[in-house]
A protein has these predicted regions:
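His/Glu-based metal-binding/catalytic segments typifying zinc-dependent metallopeptidases
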Residues: 1-44
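Short, flexible turn/loop "capping" segments at secondary-structure junctions
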Residues: 7-10, 65-71, 141, 167-168
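Buried hydrophobic packing residues in well-ordered domains
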Residues: 16, 32-34, 50, 75, ...
Length: 183
């Protein structure tokens, strides 16, 4: 699944979309914690491997998306046309390496990251309203902040790794924008 839009741009934009679970799925918090390991800040796998170790990009991220009944894991990187092929390869490899599991240390950082983001989002009326509206649409009810925090904290390393083994991220839709050839 590949879409290429060739345009004269300063950078090549790379987007990946992997099927994922939505908030109604029992594995939702395991998936969100795995995503936080992948892209939750400067100690995340994407930041460390794609930006710090290899210097392929300035910006790289992954985030949840989707509609009712179908979640998505989206990944993004912006790079030069000369490095687009390698960047795409490394970005895919890091997402797909999640199937090997995460460590206790990574999970601990991910839990802190998600709970911190939850607290920060609660500080914004707009963010909380959007979260409540999304919950109503996706779940038919609004989750309390304490419910979300308890679900994050209650998700074990075994649960995350079992989820990742059962739901490996493979065969993404790939979108490329820029001056790309044979990527």
């Amino acid at each position: 699944h590949r879409f290429v839009l060739r345009r004269p741009t300063a950078q090549v934009q790379i987007g990946l979309a992997y099927p994922d679970v939505g908030p109604e799925d029992p594995g939702f918090y395991a998936a969100r914690l795995a995503l936080e390991v992948l892209s939750g800040g400067m100690s995340s796998r994407l930041f460390t491997e794609v930006r710090e170790k290899r210097g392929l990009v300035y910006a790289v991220s992954a985030f949840p998306a989707g509609v009712k009944g179908q979640g998505l894991l989206m990944a993004y990187a912006g790079t030069t046309k000369e490095r687009a092929g390698e960047t795409l390869e490394v970005l895919r490899a890091e997402v797909e390496r999640l199937a090997e599991g995460v460590t206790e240390e990574e999970l601990s950082r991910a839990k802190v990251g998600l709970k911190t983001a939850l607290v920060m989002a609660d500080e914004s009326i707009r963010s909380r309203a959007a979260s409540m509206a999304r919950d109503l649409y996706m779940l038919g009810r609004v989750r309390s902040l304490s419910e979300i925090e308890a679900a994050i904290e209650g998700t074990s390393l075994e649960a995350v790794n079992a989820f990742l083994r059962a739901h490996p991220y493979r065969d993404p839709w790939v979108g490329l924008l820029g001056e790309v050839e044979d990527v």
